[in-house]
């Protein structure tokens, strides 16, 4: 499957990976959109204390995580930006909630 087809699958909460060049524990997914309320912000482990203080002092009462494409790499999750080689590759595969056992090749 090409990158365009693969990224469309990410939008449906599937995840994608390359058949070649990547370890078995590397894949791309979209973070589920989330709204964080003001009671949760001070407890967030993903934000530095100085950022939490800035948010609170600015009077912001909620945070919204939207459209974040992430790369899972052997336990590490980082933001994903595709390379040119990845964009033009035709060896993408996908898994969805319905088929977690088998990779689907389109």
Regions found by a protein language model. Give the residues of each.
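Extended non-catalytic interaction/regulatory regions in multidomain proteins
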Residues: 1-72
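Short, compact, well-ordered microdomains
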Residues: 62-106
